Each structure stands twice: as C-alpha cells, then as structure tokens.
Amino acid sequence: AVPRFVSILNREAEISIHLERPSVDQLVTRKLTDYRLALYASRAYLDRHPPIEKREDLAAHAWIDYVDDLLFSQELKLLSSFCRNPKVVFHSTSVIAQHQAARSGLGIAVLPCFMAAGDPGLVPLLPGEGIERSYWISSRRELHKSVRLRVLWDYVVELCAHEQGLLLGESS
C-alpha cells in the first residue's frame, strides 16, 4: 500500500498533519509535536543473532525499511542515521507492516516510540540512540477561523501536548 495524499488546498480535507513543515502561503501551519523514533527488534530475532551493544554492531544485522523509490518524505530516510550500507531484508511503504515484520523476527526496524515502546513483542535497542522528528498541523487560512475546525485543531494540539511523554518514548 502506498500512502494516499489528500490536498487541503483542493478541499479534500480541512486539517492535515505533515512530516515536514508545508511552505504554502494559503495555509495556517504550526508545529504540532516532536516525536522520537528508535531501534526495535523481537526477542526471537535477538536470540538468533549476535548481540548489539554499540552502533558498530548494527552492520551485521538484518534491517526493515521503507521502499526508497516510494518515499513521500525525506524525513523517512532513517536507516542511514544508524548504519552505513544496511542489509535490508524487508521493504514496505507501511510503518504498520514494518512494525509487524520486526515483531515476527525478520530484523531491526526504526519505529516511532509511540507505536513500539509499549509492545511486549519488541525490545528497544541501544537506549539513548534515536531520532527526533516533528509533526506539523495545517489548515486553509480561510477555514482557520471556523469554530468547528478550531475545536478539532485545539483538541489535537492539546492531546499531543498531553501525550508528549509517549510521543518522545519517555513512557508507554
């Protein structure tokens, strides 16, 4: 599956959440939240492979990653932050499929902490090593004054602020 884009400029949606800050004048945009990604693998995978104690150990392991040719954002180019020339054994455009591949023991995945930290089927690797990224929220300028839109906007912003620990991998 390839992520489907909707255009708030073409009125396909009223609010959009992005991996990168949109640079369109017709939009009201603000940073929604920071979030953290980290390395995870299943206990079964770790039991079958050499131990991972430092970054240099990662080169000997199997990896799970996005399909490079189908990346819709450079923010998803994550593996190079951890390993040069990784041996990728599973590619998917879906972070959910990557999560399941890691749970099933295929290899190491870079996953959002809010998705993986509370999963008993995954073990976090190299504590303290991770990547921080941001989500951005936007709406069309002419709709931003709408009470209905602002109620939802404010709710999403408040929810992310309340769940900051989860988003940054500090709690699960």
Task: Walk through the language-model features, giving the residues of each.
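Short beta-strand-to-loop elements that line the ligand-binding cleft
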Residues: 1, 65, 85-94
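Central regulatory/effector-binding core of bacterial HTH transcription factors
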Residues: 1-25, 172
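Alpha-to-beta junction loops
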Residues: 11-16, 37, 102-108
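Short secondary-structure boundary segments
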Residues: 20, 43, 112-114
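Flexible hinge/capping segments at coil-to-helix
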Residues: 25-64
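C-terminal effector-binding regulatory domain of bacterial HTH transcription factors
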Residues: 56, 113, 118-121, 128-172
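Secondary-structure junction motif
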Residues: 59-81
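A ligand-binding cleft/hinge motif common to bilobed small-molecule-binding domains
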Residues: 98-121
